[in-house]
């Protein structure tokens, strides 16, 4: 089983990396891009079979290590 975790800055937090990418895209002529938000993608390969206990474990991993919940939000999917 695999878990895909997506971590992004909260909307209320300034994203300087995203702003730099947006400006670089504009300099390259891609002026249609209104906003860019950068984040992290994490893939976890799990030994566990798909059951109801996996979701809470991934949530705990995110809250304790993978995301800084003060400034970041996360979501995950099990595949």
Q: Model regions: which residues?
A:
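Long, contiguous binding/interaction regions
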Residues: 2-4, 8-41, 56-79
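Amphipathic alpha-helical segments that form the core helices of the histone-fold
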Residues: 42-47
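Helix N-cap motif at beta-to-alpha junctions
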Residues: 48-52
